[in-house]
Amino acid sequence: MTLAELLPSVGMTGEPALETGLWPLGTRLERGELLLGGVPATELAARFGTPCQVLDEGTVRARARAFREALPEAEVVFAGKALPCREVYRWVADEGLSLDVCSAGELAIARSVGFPAERVLLHGNVKTPEDLKAALGYGVGRVVVDSFDEIEQLGALAEGPQDVLVRVTPGVDPRTHRAVATGVEDQKFGFSLAGGDALEAVLRVVEQPSLRLVGLHCHVGSQVRHVAVYEEAARRVVGLIASCGVRIEQLDLGGGFAVPYLPGEGEFDLGGFAHRVRVALSHECALRRVPVPRLSIEPGRAVVARAGVTLYRVAAVKRGVRRVFVAVDGGMSDNPRPALYGSRYAVRLVRRGGRRAPVTVVGRHCEAGDVLAEDVPLPEDVRAGDLLAVPVTGAYHHALASNYNAVGRPPVVGVRDGVARVLVRRETEEDLLRREV
């Protein structure tokens, strides 16, 4: 099979239609212009420079509501690590979501916008004393404990009954990239169910007078496409509930709901998930004669990924022996996911069509592995100065950005109803030097 057969748009002329399911809700083409939140992409690039991470507020809010509507009886917790940004935390708070944070830094962002403390969960396999003290000082609703050492430390620091959940490793294969498979045995997260550590952790929490066990937590992985994985995790954790002899009020199944990054990749079946997990939970609890706990879920990527689009300016085009390289003014400092996980993206040239051929889009950094997208169809006459748009960049882009090669991180620009505003400003050379002594 040829590349043209694999990528039907290769060789076509004219401007391609927007790929279904990849762009923010309401994105449209108007007289050749790509409109994001009603704002032309060319205007965004001119006003805010490139690279520029654009975030559509309406899409974030709509995705948050979709989870609440699918599971109205459950607690929906936004995984704050996906996009730690004050405005995003405000938006999800407005939509009734709770928030999980993994550090005193993420908690500081939540505090700065007055996020209700009772709706905050503290996560992480390592929580420093500073993290725990910050959480206790703010009065976070729950702490998800992840090690025996942490149970002792938290028990010693907490002055009153602090609600906790025990993170369980259910031993379920999520069928995803090994770097984000967190529910399998023999890895750093949680207490092993099969090895007996999970039951021991429950008993140790109960023994701590300053801690109150309210629930169990598990997270099977990221980019999980199969609902059956969550069903099996729920069944296994209910088995622990039945054996521990302690009333468990909450069962948090974590997040990891897959989103499409490329044309043709399907959406996660949220409706099917809601129905099948309810049935599995009810059936297993009835079978084991334990009360059905309240369900919690923690979508992060599934709330913000599609809301994001990154704009890059083409800096150079090089024609190699076998490939055409299109080099842009960003790269692995604003998107390390291709280097970390082999992630793939679609790319669009803004405001110009033409006959297309496969190219490799590469970044500006001093690494051969700084590749943003391979074998993507772009117009054959792509040239320096062109504007490229990459969709599905709302999750783990701003969060994972670095200063490699002392390059400042790009801004995050929010768009809604034809209005654009800076949510996080571009990092400057002065910012980079400020920490030097």
UniProtKB/Swiss-Prot annotation:
- Residues binding pyridoxal 5'-phosphate, per UniProt: 256, 298-301, 396
For this UniProt record, the keywords arranged alphabetically read as follows: Amino-acid biosynthesis, Decarboxylase, Lyase, Lysine biosynthesis, Pyridoxal phosphate
Where, in this chain's numbering, is substrate bound?
301, 337, 341, 367, 396
Query: What are its E.C. numbers?
Result: 4.1.1.20
The catalytic site is made up of: 366 (proton donor)
Q: Which residues cross the membrane?
A: none
Q: How does it assemble?
A: Homodimer.
Family affiliation: Belongs to the Orn/Lys/Arg decarboxylase class-II family. LysA subfamily.
Function as written in the Swiss-Prot or TrEMBL entry: Specifically catalyzes the decarboxylation of meso-diaminopimelate (meso-DAP) to L-lysine.
In Swiss-Prot or TrEMBL terms, this protein is called: Diaminopimelate decarboxylase
